[in-house]
Amino acid sequence: MQRSPYTPGSIAPVVYGREALLRDARRDLAFMKEFPELKGRLEIFVGSRGVGKTSLLRTIENDARSLGFDTCWITSGDGPFLSALVEALDTLSRDWQDAAREQLARVLRNLSVTVGGVKFTGASDAEPREVSSLGRVVQQTLQKAAEGTTSPGLVLLIDEIQAADADGLRALAYAWQHLQSEAPGLPLMTFCAGLTHSQDVITDAVSFAERFRYRQLENLDPEASRAALEEPALARGVHWTPEALDIALTLAAGYPYFLQVIGDEAWKAANYPDPGEVIDAPHVSEANSQFREVQRIFFRSRWMKATPLEQEFMAAMAAEGGAPARRGEIAERMGRTTQSISMVRRSLMDKGLID
């Protein structure tokens, strides 16, 4: 018996179908190691839940570490974004040499995030005073962090960026703008991941968009889907029969999370196969009942997260039968104006229920 190599709901150890994105990220890391300088734009991977954004971000983090970079992981949404940034940088600097650690610690001590903005105190411990430019404070913090590392550079990785507060996003954008013109040789880059409407959230927070580059993650194509099922099994000496593979691919329809689910359930149905054994069609047929139950729970949990009005919106969308639904058509089915459903649509996007 062997443990299942499939990881539904967990970080995937191997990311399939994202080779172009990984190739670009690895090239950027290699260039920064050889030619230290600021990566001009923040890279943001966007897509629906379950398409592998966080797994992609973790893979880039591992690649960066393998090249000797310091990395800083931030998950947005659990409190102010800048609080999370301060905490992550503080944790990072604990292994630094005393002088560099104290320089960054001095900046971090001077930065206390409040609901309405940022306050800081000088070395004299005077009363806190409002900072005229939050972006400048974040710029100073990032600059000290990147200068303090003894590695080839610092890589920031920001997950769930659509959940970051507007003040934090605005400060990050302006800080990056300042760094581009004032510290172009700083070895610092940022990769982010977020839901499909992340661009709307960021645009609402800051008027300029040229600091960000958005990369869309879609469902996997047939070749990548096949690899996502076959290769983990082959690594353990187990083969899928062609018929079993075709059935599983049809069930998952290219959705990365469902590929992991059907792979995991088929592995269990095959009784955790040893090297040399196979997963065949009867195993997938047996796995299908549990796969359908996972799907039912998956969709029900999302449906129950929605308010009655949001459920009405999704029902109106579903009337298109899978085709892209226009806002005007949805509003007409709901008997409402296009403007009146804007907040409902945005709420559903914030919850990750629609794209």
Q: Residue spans of the language-model regions?
A:
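P-loop NTPase nucleotide-binding core
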Residues: 37-166, 188, 336, 349
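Sensor-1/coupling segment of RecA-like P-loop NTPase cores
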Residues: 155, 163-206, 214
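Conserved small helical "lid"/interfacial subdomain of P-loop NTPases
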Residues: 217-244, 262
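A short, basic N-terminal segment
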Residues: 1-41, 91, 184
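A short, conserved structural fragment
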Residues: 349-355
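Short conserved motifs of the RecA-like P-loop NTPase core
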Residues: 239-251, 325, 329
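Winged-helix-like regulatory helical subdomains adjacent to P-loop NTPase cores
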Residues: 254, 260-338
